Regions:
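Short, hydrophobic beta-strand segments that form beta-sheet elements in well-ordered domains
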Residues: 149-155
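Active-site ExK catalytic segment of metal-dependent nucleases
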Residues: 122-131
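Accessory nucleic acid-recognition modules appended to NTPase machines
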Residues: 2-119
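Switch/connector loops and helix/strand junctions flanking conserved nucleotide-binding motifs
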Residues: 62, 134, 160-164
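Active-site-adjacent loop/helix micro-motif of nuclease/hydrolase catalytic cores
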Residues: 131-139
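Arginine/glycine-rich "motif VI" loop of SF2 helicases in the C-terminal RecA-like domain
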Residues: 95-96, 141-149
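Domain-level recognition of nuclease-like catalytic cores that cleave nucleotide substrates
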Residues: 158-175
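Structural signal for conserved beta-strand scaffold positions within catalytic alpha/beta enzyme cores
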Residues: 34, 54, 104, 126, ...
Length: 175
């Protein structure tokens, strides 16, 4: 069940305030945080369901029961894990007292995994765990709509995931 389905059910039950409070508790404990949708209109940002981002991938792997080899063999699971690791790296930076903010972006079927805004700089980040197709319609649509300072492909044919994680996030904002 995706977070928007869960939110819809809880809205029917009148528990959105409770859900928001639980998300705050999980974020305060350093476990999970909600990423808001990136938009030019701040009011519309608050009206969308957050994308849940784990802050430590051990939360995912501990409950999976998969060995490292099994996890890598399951392309879908590995893709979620790699995206979550990159997201955790970004979210931990954005939540560390910096002025940086982390979002996701989606418009119809087009999406960008992460949008990092630091001051006047905006970095669009797409994560791929395997070989990525050369076309990234979400990145192209985002670039057309928002003119980011930088667009970054992590994994696939872009920056290797291990290299991305080795550098502080400021490296990717300023270089």
């Amino acid at each position: 069940m995706c977070s928007s389905d869960l939110l819809g059910q809880l809205q029917d039950a009148g528990n959105t305030t409770t859900l928001a409070h639980y998300l705050e508790l999980l974020a305060g404990a350093g476990m999970v945080r909600g990423l808001q949708k990136y938009t030019a209109d701040a009011a519309r940002t608050r009206g969308t369901s957050p994308k849940l981002q784990v802050l430590n991938t051990a939360l995912m792997t501990a409950s999976s029961g998969l060995t490292l080899d099994d996890a890598r063999a399951d392309r879908e699971w590995w893709g979620h894990l790699v995206e979550s690791a990159v997201g955790a790296h970004l979210a931990n930076f954005a939540g560390s007292g910096t002025s940086a903010e982390l979002f996701y972006w989606r418009d119809g079927g087009r999406e960008v995994d992460f949008v990092l805004r630091a001051g006047r700089k905006t970095v669009a980040i797409e994560v791929k765990s395997g070989r990525a197709p050369m076309a990234h319609p979400g990145m192209a649509a985002f670039a057309s709509a928002f003119k980011p300072t930088r667009m970054l492909l992590v994994g696939g044919d872009g920056v290797p995931v291990d290299e991305f994680l080795r550098h502080p996030v400021t490296h990717w904002i300023t270089s």
